From Swiss-Prot:
<dbReference type="Pfam" id="PF03726">
    <property type="entry name" value="PNPase"/>
</dbReference>
<keyword id="KW-0694">RNA-binding</keyword>
<dbReference type="GO" id="GO:0005829">
    <property type="term" value="C:cytosol"/>
</dbReference>
<feature type="compositionally biased region" description="Basic and acidic residues">
    <location>
        <begin position="743"/>
        <end position="752"/>
    </location>
</feature>
<dbReference type="GO" id="GO:0000287">
    <property type="term" value="F:magnesium ion binding"/>
</dbReference>
<dbReference type="InterPro" id="IPR004088">
    <property type="entry name" value="KH_dom_type_1"/>
</dbReference>
<dbReference type="Pfam" id="PF00013">
    <property type="entry name" value="KH_1"/>
</dbReference>
<keyword id="KW-0963">Cytoplasm</keyword>
<dbReference type="InterPro" id="IPR015848">
    <property type="entry name" value="PNPase_PH_RNA-bd_bac/org-type"/>
</dbReference>
<dbReference type="InterPro" id="IPR012340">
    <property type="entry name" value="NA-bd_OB-fold"/>
</dbReference>
<feature type="binding site">
    <location>
        <position position="532"/>
    </location>
    <ligand>
        <name>Mg(2+)</name>
    </ligand>
</feature>
<feature type="region of interest" description="Disordered">
    <location>
        <begin position="739"/>
        <end position="763"/>
    </location>
</feature>
<dbReference type="InterPro" id="IPR036612">
    <property type="entry name" value="KH_dom_type_1_sf"/>
</dbReference>
<dbReference type="InterPro" id="IPR003029">
    <property type="entry name" value="S1_domain"/>
</dbReference>
<dbReference type="InterPro" id="IPR036345">
    <property type="entry name" value="ExoRNase_PH_dom2_sf"/>
</dbReference>
<dbReference type="GO" id="GO:0000175">
    <property type="term" value="F:3'-5'-RNA exonuclease activity"/>
</dbReference>
<dbReference type="Pfam" id="PF00575">
    <property type="entry name" value="S1"/>
</dbReference>
Length: 763
C-alpha cells in the first residue's frame, strides 16, 4: 500500500500481515502529528487498538572522547495505556518494569549495528506505550516503531529494521499472534532483520532472534503437536522473512516521503591505516604466538605485555595517538584469531571447532539451601541456588504485560570478580536482567504444574567465573539445583553458546566465502566473531534460543549446521549433568512442606474470619502458613508435616464440616470458666463443657479456677452429645492417654482441631 497523506504534513503507510485462516493483522505507521520537535517521530498502530509513539533524537555535538557508540533506548510503559492507575505508593510510573527493560534490549540489538561505524553523537530512542489491547504484546511493535522514527530522523542509519513475532500454532507459523493464540503455540519467536540486495535478488538479513518454547509445550507435543526441533526452528526463521520484508517496505515508503534529509555527522574511526600498519609490523609475530596460550589469564597477561611493548616502541613516532594504537592492536588480535580459525580450524585455546571445554557438575554445595549446584565449563563457573516457598511469595507484576504474577523467578548475578576486575555491585543492570530472563525462558517449559508442585520457586545464578556464555552455564546449573531441591522437572535442560567466523578465503587462486561454526565459544571468540548463538533445550527439542549476528544474513545451511552442532554439544552436557543427578532428590529438611486442599468458595470468608481473625488464629496455633486463592484452593505450608496436618484439619473443620462422635478424644484449650465448669475449644467454633464435678478427678472442688484457667490445655473425651448438639466432656487420665499412644492408638485421639470436621454450633 502506498503512502497516504492524512492532512497537511501528516503521512501514513500500512503493512498487512496475512495469516490465512488465523486472520490478518494490520501495522500502521504515522508521522507528522506527534512529537514534532524530535529529530524523527512515528506512531505505530497494531490493528488500531495498540498504539506506540517512538521519538529519536541526536545530540548536536559528537562525544569524540568516547570509544563507543552512545546509543540509548528507553521504553516508557504508561499505565493509562491499559486504563489503570499504577499500583505504587505514589501512583505514578517509576523505574522500568522487567518487560520494558527486555524490550529495550530487543530494540537495541538490531538497531545498534545498523548505524555507521565511528558515530559518536549521542542517539536516544524513546518508545512510549500509549494504548495497549489486552490481547496484544507490544514488544515487537516497538522494534518497528523505533526503526521508523530513526529512519525519519536523517541519521546515518542503514535501516529500516523490521521485527515480527511468529508462533508455531497447529503446525502453522502465525505472525503477530494474540495472547490467546499463544496458549495453543508450541514455540514463540521474535525475529528482526532488514532487506539486503535489490529487485529479485533482495533478501532479508536476519539480525536478531529471541525464541522460546511455550509453557505447555510438553503437553501439546504429547497430544500430537509438532515438537520444536532444530529443523523446525530453522523453518521458522525462513517463515519470518516475508513478514519482515512487508514491514520494512512499509517503513521505507514512509521514509521516502517524509524523512528528513540525511545530515552530516562526523565519524571517528578507531584508527587510521598508518597506525594499523605500524602495529602489525611490530606485533604480529609475538601476538600470534601469545594467542596459542590455552589459559585465559596467562594469555591475557601475555597480550597485555605485548601491548605495552608496542605502545613503548610507537610512542615517539605516533605521539598523542595512543588510543589509535590500542584500537589497532585489538583489531590485529581479532584478525589473527579469525584467520587461524578459518584456515586451520584451530582456536585460541587449542580446541577443534566442535570441541567442548572440560565439564564438571556437582550438587548440594550450599549447606542450608533448598537446592544448589556448581556447574563448570572451562573457566566459566556458575553456582545455582534454588529456594522454595509458599505460592503467595510469587512475584506480583505491575506492568502492561499479560502476566500479573510469576511463580518461577530466575535472577542472574554477574559480579566484577568473575572476570578478575573491580566494579560496581548492587542493583542488576540490563545485561543481568536479560541473561536471567533467557535462562528463565529456557526452564519454564519443563517446570511442573502448580497442581503437581505447589511452590513458588526462586532460582539464583551466581556467575563466579566468566569466559564465555555464563547465561547458558546458568541454565545447566539451574537444572541441577532444581533437581537437587526436589523439583520434578519434566526433563533436564542444558544450554550451549555457538559462534561463527566468516570471511573470503583464497582457495587455489579462487576467492570463496567460508563459514566456520564454533561450539562453546570463549569470551574472545564472542567479541571477535560474527555471531553469538545461544541454544538451550532438552534431548528432544529446543526450549530457548537467542541469536545476534553482525552479518547481512546467514545462509540457511550454515544456520542449520550450527543448530545441529549445538544439539550434539547439548547432549554431551546433559550426559555429564546426569552423572551428578538424574532425578529429583528428596526435598531439603529446611524447605517448607506445602499441601493443597480445596474448600467451597462460599466458605472462604469463614476460613478467613472477620478481619482475618480465624486464619490468624490457625496460623498462630499450628505454626503453619496459609494462602487462599479465589477459587477455593488453599495452600498450607509448614516446617513439618504435623503442623501442616493440624492446620488442614482446622480448615476442614470450618469449610468441610463433619459432626464429632462420642468417644473421640481431643487436646483442647480452655476458653471460658464458669461456676459450673470449663468450656474447652475442640474445633474452630465447636466447644464442649467439662462439668465441675468431672474436674476434680473424683474429689469435690469448690471453684473451677482452682483446677484450670483460661488457656490451659486439657486432654478430653466426648462423653455425650445431646439432641441440641451440646457436647459433654470428661478428662482423660494421663496414664490412659500415654498407654493409648504407646499402643499406637493415635487415630482415636486428636490434637485440637484434628478431629473430624464439624459445623460450628452453640455448645
Amino acid at each position: 500500500m502506498s503512502v497516504v497523506e492524512l492532512e497537511d504534513g501528516v503521512y501514513e503507510s500500512t503493512a498487512v500481515i496475512d495469516n490465512g485462516s488465523f486472520g490478518t493483522r494490520t501495522i500502521r505507521f504515522e508521522t507528522g502529528r506527534l512529537a514534532q520537535q524530535a529529530a524523527g517521530s512515528a506512531v505505530a498502530y497494531l490493528d488500531d487498538e495498540t498504539m506506540l509513539l517512538s521519538a529519536t533524537t541526536a545530540s548536536k555535538n559528537p562525544k569524540d572522547h568516547f570509544d563507543f557508540f552512545p546509543l540509548t533506548v528507553d521504553v516508557e510503559e504508561r499505565m493509562y495505556a491499559a486504563g489503570r492507575i499504577p499500583g505504587s505508593f505514589f501512583r505514578r510510573e517509576g523505574r522500568p518494569s522487567t518487560d520494558a527493560i527486555l524490550t529495550c534490549r530487543l530494540i537495541d540489538r538490531p538497531l545498534r549495528p545498523s548505524f555507521v561505524d565511528g558515530l559518536r553523537n549521542e542517539i536516544q530512542v524513546v518508545v512510549t506505550v500509549m494504548s495497549l489491547d489486552p490481547k496484544d504484546l507490544y514488544d515487537v511493535l516497538a522494534i518497528n516503531a523505533a526503526s521508523m522514527s530513526t529512519q525519519l530522523a536523517g541519521l546515518p542509519f542503514s535501516g529500516p529494521v523490521g521485527g515480527a513475532r511468529i508462533a508455531l500454532i497447529d503446525g502453522t507459523w502465525v505472525a503477530f499472534p494474540t495472547v490467546e493464540q499463544l496458549e495453543r503455540a508450541v514455540f514463540d519467536m521474535v525475529v528482526a532483520g532488514r532487506i539486503v540486495g535489490d529487485g529479485d535478488s533482495a533478501d532479508v538479513a536476519i539480525m536478531m532472534v529471541e525464541a522460546e518454547a511455550t509453557e505447555n509445550v510438553v503437553e501439546l507435543v504429547a497430544g500430537g503437536a509438532q515438537a520444536p526441533t532444530e529443523a523446525v526452528v530453522a523453518e521458522g526463521l525462513e517463515a519470518a522473512k516475508p513478514f519482515i520484508k512487508a514491514l520494512c517496505a512499509a517503513q521505507q515508503e514512509l521514509a521516502d516521503r517524509a524523512a528528513k534529509p540525511a545530515g552530516e555527522y562526523p565519524v571517528f574511526p578507531d584508527y587510521e591505516a598508518d597506525v594499523y600498519d605500524a602495529v602489525a609490523s611490530v606485533a604480529t609475530e609475538a601476538l600470534a604466538e601469545a594467542l596459542t596460550i590455552a589459559g585465559k589469564t596467562e594469555r591475557n597477561d601475555r597480550t597485555d605485555e605485548i601491548k605495552v611493548e608496542v605502545l613503548e616502541r610507537l610512542a615517539e613516532p605516533y605521539a598523542g595517538r595512543e588510543k589509535e594504537i590500542g584500537a589497532a592492536f585489538r583489531s590485529l588480535t581479532k584478525k589473527l584469531v579469525r584467520q587461524r580459525i578459518l584456515t586451520d580450524h584451530f582456536r585460541i585455546d587449542g580446541r577443534g571447532i566442535t570441541d567442548i571445554r572440560a565439564l564438571s557438575a556437582e550438587v548440594a554445595v550450599i549447606p542450608r539451601a533448598h537446592g544448589s549446584a556448581l556447574f563448570e565449563r572451562g573457566e566459566t563457573q556458575i553456582l545455582g541456588v534454588t529456594t522454595l516457598d509458599m505460592i503467595k511469595m510469587a512475584q506480583q507484576i505491575d506492568s502492561l504485560g499479560p502476566e500479573n504474577t510469576k511463580r518461577y523467578m530466575h535472577h542472574y548475578n554477574f559480579p566484577p570478580y568473575s572476570t578478575g576486575e573491580t566494579g560496581r555491585v548492587g542493583s542488576p543492570k540490563r545485561r543481568e536482567i536479560g541473561h536471567g530472563a533467557l535462562a528463565e525462558r529456557a526452564l519454564v517449559p519443563v517446570l511442573p504444574s502448580i497442581e503437581e508442585f505447589p511452590y513458588a520457586i526462586r532460582q539464583v545464578s551466581e556467575a563466579l567465573g566468566s569466559n564465555g556464555s555464563t547465561s547458558m552455564g546458568s541454565v545447566c546449573a539451574s537444572t541441577l539445583a532444581l533437581l537437587n531441591a526436589g523439583v520434578p522437572l519434566k526433563a533436564p535442560v542444558a544450554g550451549i553458546a555457538m559462534g561463527l567466523v566468516s570471511d573470503d578465503v583464497d582457495v587455489d587462486g579462487k576467492v570463496e566465502k567460508r563459514y566456520v561454526a564454533l561450539t562453546d565459544i570463549l569470551g574472545a571468540e564472542d567479541a571477535f566473531g560474527d555471531m553469538d548463538f545461544k541454544v538451550a533445550g532438552t534431548k528432544d527439542f529446543v526450549t530457548a534460543l537467542q541469536l545476534d549476528t553482525k552479518l547481512d544474513g546467514i545462509p540457511s545451511q550454515v544456520l542449520a549446521g550450527a543448530l545441529s552442532q549445538a544439539k550434539d554439544a547439548r547432549l554431551t552436557i546433559l550426559d555429564v549433568m546426569a552423572e551428578a543427578i538424574d532425578r529429583p532428590d528428596e526435598m531439603s529438611p529446611y524447605a517448607p512442606r506445602i499441601t493443597t486442599i480445596k474448600v467451597p468458595v462460599d466458605k472462604i470468608g469463614e476460613v478467613i474470619g472477620p478481619k482475618g481473625k480465624m486464619i490468624n488464629s490457625i496460623t498462630e496455633e499450628t505454626g503453619a502458613q496459609i494462602s487462599i486463592e479465589d477459587d477455593g484452593t488453599v495452600f498450607v505450608g509448614a516446617a513439618d508435616g504435623l503442623s501442616a496436618q493440624a492446620a488442614i484439619d482446622k480448615i476442614n473443620a470450618i469449610a468441610n464440616p463433619q459432626l464429632p462422635k462420642v468417644g473421640e478424644r481431643f487436646l483442647g484449650t480452655v476458653v471460658k470458666t464458669t461456676d459450673f465448669g470449663a468450656f474447652v475449644s475442640l474445633l474452630p467454633g465447636r466447644d464442649g463443657l467439662v462439668h465441675i464435678s468431672k474436674l476434680g478427678k473424683g474429689k469435690r472442688i469448690a471453684k473451677v479456677e482452682d483446677v484450670v484457667k483460661v488457656g490451659d490445655k486439657l486432654r478430653v473425651e466426648i462423653a455425650d452429645i445431646d439432641n441440641r448438639g451440646k457436647i459433654s466432656l470428661v478428662l482423660v487420665a494421663e496414664e490412659s492417654a500415654e498407654s493409648a499412644e504407646s499402643a499406637g492408638d493415635k487415630g482415636a485421639e486428636k490434637a485440637e482441631g484434628a478431629a473430624a470436621d464439624v459445623t460450628p454450633a452453640e455448645a
